[in-house]
Amino acid sequence: LEEGEITSKVKFPPSSSPSFPRLVMVGTLPDLQEITLCYWFKVNQLKGTLGHSRVLBMFSYATAKKDNELLTFLDEQGDFLFNV
């Protein structure tokens, strides 16, 4: 990192909740100029909802104009997709 850059780490504890962990920022950051996503995942079974092309959302970045400005997800075939 260079001087003045902002970095954060977030650790989600195990959850017995049926909903996925969610991080909501309190306050604001400078406008997003670039982003790096890096994660590892292993999917044992995909259960799609009839009529939905997205089965498992992995990451979503919302803006004031659009809920899923950046979205990574797995589709019914198990393909990893990135939408901007």
From Swiss-Prot:
It comes from the Eukaryota. Residues 6-84 form the Pentraxin (PTX) domain. Pfam families: Pentaxin. Keywords: Antiviral protein, Calcium, Disulfide bond, Lectin, Metal-binding. A disulfide bond links Cys-38 to a Cys in the C-terminal half of the chain of 163 residues. GO terms for biological process: regulation of defense response to virus. Homopentamer. Pentraxin (or pentaxin) have a discoid arrangement of 5 non-covalently bound subunits. It comes from Limulus polyphemus (Atlantic horseshoe crab). InterPro entries: ConA-like_dom_sf (IPR013320), Pentraxin-related (IPR001759). GO terms for molecular function: carbohydrate binding; metal ion binding. The keyword Disulfide bond applies. This is Limulin. Lectin that binds sialic acid. Displays antiviral activity and therefore may contribute to defense against infections. Ca(2+) binds at D67, N68. Its cofactor is Ca(2+).
